[in-house]
UniProtKB/Swiss-Prot annotation:
It holds the Pfam family DUF150_C. One of its GO terms (cellular component) is cytosol. HAMAP family: RimP. Its main location: cytoplasm. The keyword Cytoplasm applies. This is Ribosome maturation factor RimP. NCBIfam families: PRK00092.2-5. Keywords: Cytoplasm, Ribosome biogenesis. InterPro entries: Ribosome_maturation_RimP, RimP_C, RimP_C_sf, RimP_N, RimP_N_sf. The gene is rimP.
């Protein structure tokens, strides 16, 4: 999947209510800057806090990127004025134990542990935890690490039933996330070098 495909890929898990209105305001700005929205949440911390999670199309996000995103969306939010009280704007990367919101997240992080929740019962459950062993256009196969008596070890979860999903922090995940970040930075540096030579 290319970066162009990534920026056009819709999120499986989206917000509702005010959070949805905020996402509708913020997402076009992010896409125009080469970023993808992961999640928007209004929290009642330290007064009110708007938490925006984003990443570049290649999956990276630096402190400078967070600052750039904050400076770009702040004036748009001031003009749209969707919140009727003072709030703090907090922009961050999704982190290593990130929310999984797109189909490509399940492909990219195949082999890693995830905990997820579904909107409907699948095999008498709505909550699952296990390793992503396969992902396709319709859903993903989870190999559970905690199987109750009489349950199958593997379960297929359709994307249409998914209501929440998040990676579980493990040593393998940290290693692979650092490796992916290093590779993305090297590719960006090579691209910048090629652009400078033109």
């Amino acid at each position: 999947m290319t970066n162009a495909d990534n920026e056009l890929e819709p999120r499986l898990i989206t917000e509702t209510g005010l959070d949805q209105r905020l996402a509708d305001i913020i997402e076009p700005v992010l896409v125009g800057m080469g970023f993808r929205l992961i999640r928007v949440r209004m929290l009642n911390q330290n007064g009110a806090t708007m938490q925006v999670m984003a990443e570049r199309n290649d999956g990276t996000m630096t402190v400078q990127d967070c600052e750039e995103v904050s400076m770009a969306i702040s004036p748009v939010l001031d003009v749209e004025d969707p919140i009727d009280k003072e709030y703090h704007l907090e922009v961050s990367s999704p982190g290593i134990d990130r929310p999984m919101v797109r189909k490509s997240d399940f492909v990219r992080w195949q082999g890693h542990l995830v905990k997820c929740e579904t909107s409907i019962m699948i095999g008498n459950r709505k909550r699952f935890r296990g390793k992503i062993v396969e992902a396709d256009a319709d859903g993903f196969t989870l190999e559970r690490d905690q199987v109750a008596y009489g349950e199958e070890q593997k379960v297929i979860i359709p994307f249409t039933a998914l209501s929440d999903a998040k990676l579980i922090l493990t040593d393998d995940l940290i290693r692979d996330a650092l490796r992916a970040d290093k590779l993305a930075k090297a590719q960006a540096a090579n691209q910048n070098e090629a652009d400078d030579q033109e």
